[in-house]
Amino acid sequence: MKSLKSSTHDVPHPEHVVWAPPAYDEQHHLFFSHGTVLIGIVGSLIITVAVVGNVLVCLAIFTEPILSHSKSNFFIVSLAVADLLLALLVMTFALVNDMYGYWLFGETFCFIWMSADVMCETASIFSICVISYDRLKQVQKPLHYEEFMTTTRALLIIACLWICSFVLSFVPIFLEWHELSVEEIKAIFKDNKTEKEKALEAHNFSSALNQTLGDNQKSNAKHVCLFDVHFTYSVIYSFICFYVPCTLMLTNYLRLFLIAQTHQVRIRSLQMTNPPQLRGQGASSYRNQGTQGSKAARTLTIITGTFLACWLPFFIINPIAAADEHLIPLECFMVTIWLGYFNSSVNPIIYGTSNSKFRAAFKRLLRCRSVKSVVGSISPVSPAYRAFSWIRPSRLDLSSSEHPSDACDTGRGKNSKGGDCATADPTKPDVSVSEEIIYAGTKVFDSDTAFSS
């Protein structure tokens, strides 16, 4: 969503009498004549990283059994798709528009482009908010999470997320709820004609004039894709699509941090009250939970903090620019827009550096290795092996042996290794099964599963 981009109108051409604001065109041309190369390089880099990174995220989740079995990763796919569409459908045309200084793709696509911009940004924001909520539910009630977050419920949440994003973008823009009328502009700026007023007058004038122009004349006219945002529309959109989700994200992060602190208190309590022989066992479990919870909180902080750093400047400036366009320089406004776009290229990098499962999947995809070769190379004692084993129901089946070769032969009273079957005390829990049960309860605190457990 941009305060300077949605209705298409003519920019003055030296050979024709199509009237439009020369002040805007001169300022626009002057700015980009000195920075076109830099804009092209930086914009192309942001787009490339966003496309490659988000494609890798989607491929990693769809091709890795460790990642594809997680309901949480459905929401990461939603975020990656939103960022990918933003890069392909919005950033690409925004870069061309900013480099040329005028719109090349027609009036109809101007509306589609602006609507896609608002929809993808909104879907990205909502997805990050849902991810933080999903993460909190795992930490709060890990044993009930699988029952709560079913595949149907996860897909329903994603569907609602995208439907809301579509309604908040395409409907208001195509119904022109966002636009200022000439009367509203005159009431705000009184007798001083502004660039927006001239633009709207030019649009009304040129719409009638273009009907009398020849095909060659109309083909030579240059157009600008403007988004003349009503102040009320800007405030409502910013509140619903940014400030409310951000408040929820920060609340979820705070609650997750408090849970991690609670486990730290339990660790100290166990160390002080339990006897030495039990202190190590209980404290070790809580210590792992507390440490992993702190890592998960830090990862969530990085995601949320990066998002705020990228989008907060734009959502502060946008209502101000809608109220009075002269308060915000064009250059400053464009920097905040591209800073928001930059968030779409940062998210895959954060996943790749903070999650070992994503790192392994990215390496496999970049090296074109098969899934079987990666799974076969995982050590039985590695965290990745434990995570992969955790998704297999047989690992928690107490009626079956994990190692068939060690099964007890009831006829001989011996196992396959010659050991005495009687040495296994049925009253004592099996160590491997106990580890799996503990892992099932504590895996949500693992930093590697901060957003993909």
Curated annotation (Swiss-Prot):
Sorted UniProt keywords: Cell membrane, Disulfide bond, G-protein coupled receptor, Membrane, Receptor, Transducer, Transmembrane, Transmembrane helix
Membrane-related topology note: Multi-pass membrane protein
Transmembrane spans: 37-57, 75-94, 111-133, 154-175, 224-244, 302-322, 332-352
Biased composition (Basic and acidic residues): 403-412
One GO molecular-function entry: G protein-coupled receptor activity
Tissue expression per record: Reproductive system.
Domain of life: Eukaryota
Cysteines joined through disulfide linkages: 110-225
Region (Disordered), start-end ranges: 397-428
Stored SUPFAM superfamilies: Family A G protein-coupled receptor-like
The species this protein was found in: Aplysia californica (California sea hare)
Extracellular domain ranges by topology: 1-36, 95-110, 176-223, 323-331
Location(s) in or outside the cell: Cell membrane
Family statement drawn from the similarity comment of this UniProt entry: Belongs to the G-protein coupled receptor 1 family.
Free-text function comment from the UniProt entry: This is one of the several different receptors for 5-hydroxytryptamine (serotonin). 5-HT plays important roles in various behavioral and physiological processes in aplysia. These include feeding, locomotion, circadian rhythm, learning and memory, synaptic plasticity, and synaptic growth. This receptor is mediated by G proteins that stimulate phospholipase C.
Keyword field contains Membrane: yes
Protein name stated in the entry: 5-hydroxytryptamine receptor 1
Lineage, broadest ranks: Eukaryota, Metazoa, Spiralia, Lophotrochozoa, Mollusca
